[in-house]
Structures are given as C-alpha cells and as structure tokens.
Design a protein with these regions (language model features):
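Extracytosolic ligand-binding ectodomains
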Residues: 9-22, 26-32, 39-48, 60-69, ...
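Glycine-rich anion/phosphate-binding loop at the beta-strand->alpha-helix junction
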Residues: 51
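Short, small-residue-biased leader/transition segments that mark boundaries at the very start
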Residues: 1-6
C-alpha cells in the first residue's frame, strides 16, 4: 500500500479527483503478466501508467499503445522514448560505499534501511522535456524538501479509500506502519490483497 500512497498523493496534489487503478501481477518479474496488466489498465481508460515490477514490459507496452508511462527502477528511455514522462530510479551506490567504509572502519552493524530522498537512494529522473518549466520546478522543489526532511508524503492526515483516517493530522507514518500498510489511500480503487 505504501507505494500506491506515494503515487496517489502526488497525483492528488495536482488533481484532487484523480483515480488510481491497480492490477496485481503477484510477482516481481513476469513480462507476460506485466503486458496483460498494462493492457487491462489501458482498456479501463487509464491515461498514465506506472509499475512496481522489474522488467521493461510495462513501458514497452505503453510505448507501443501510445500511453504515457512512469518507469520504475531505471529510466528506460530507450524502451519508451516517446511515452516516458519520468522515472522513479534507485541509486544504491552511495549507500553501499558508506556501508563498505563502515565495515573497513569496524563500525558495520546490521540495521534496516529505508533510504529515500534524504539518502539520495530514490530519485525522479528522465522527466520529459515536454514538461512545462513550472512543473519541473515544482517537482524539484518537493524533492529538495524531501532531501532536507522538510516534507514527508506519509504525513497525516491520510485517509484510506473507505474514508477512515489512518494517519491523523500532525502524525507521520513510521517504518513499522509503512511495512504493515494494508490499505489504499483515498483515490485508489480496490483493496490490498490479504494473501488468504
């Protein structure tokens, strides 16, 4: 649910009435299922696609079908040169350099890591050159605030898609809450699968 929360809240910041549809592949990597999911969403009328899977199938299908896409993990500019409007990219290089140095210094310890903008581990890149300058400035401004921990997308109030306040005003979801998030936020259609 936390990935959907981020995407939906971002979309709602510019269009409060946005609706987000989800199709589950239940796997990190299955290009066939990813193509099917993409075509299902396009068939439902979705006008911008994104994914949380590991292949290039979603951007490739979006490119071939003429639908805008935000890629995940890497920019995939060669896969969707006309339809890519941006990419959520992951950068572990600085983190690994820090961890390796800690090992050399005898200071390494096992600990969970939820690295985001403040650690430069998650970035928005490959923003389409067609984006208005004001939009790019807004994106850069929000990211800068995230780097400085002046803005957190998981700050309340966060209301789920059934109208229940999950994170009240003035509160911020901690790692435990994010790791156990079993709801979608307002605007997302559907429910998080329970695995039953």
């Amino acid at each position: 649910g936390s990935e959907m929360c981020i995407r939906d809240r971002g979309a709602q910041s510019v269009n409060p009435d946005v609706k987000v549809s989800v199709v589950w592949t239940n796997t990190w990597y299955d290009p066939g299922k990813e193509v099917d999911a993409t075509n299902t969403l396009i068939g439902q009328g979705c006008d911008i696609l994104t994914h949380h899977t590991d292949s290039t199938a979603v951007p490739a299908t979006a490119e071939s079908r003429g639908v805008k896409v935000i890629s995940y993990h890497s920019a995939m500019t060669k896969t969707a040169p006309k339809q890519l409007i941006g990419a959520v990219t992951h950068h572990w290089d600085e983190y690994y350099a820090h961890r390796i140095q800690a090992l050399y210094d005898g200071k390494w310890k096992v600990e969970p890591v939820w690295g985001g903008a403040e650690m430069h581990m998650v970035r928005l890149s490959a923003i389409t050159p067609d984006a208005p300058k004001s939009v790019v400035e807004d994106i850069n401004s929000v990211y800068s605030k995230m780097e400085k921990k002046e803005f957190n997308v998981f700050s309340g109030p966060i209301v789920d898609n059934e109208g229940k306040v999950q994170i009240p005003e003035g509160k911020v979801a901690d790692d435990k809450m994010l790791n156990t998030m079993n709801y979608f936020v307002k605007g997302v259609i559907g429910k998080v699968p329970t695995g039953k």
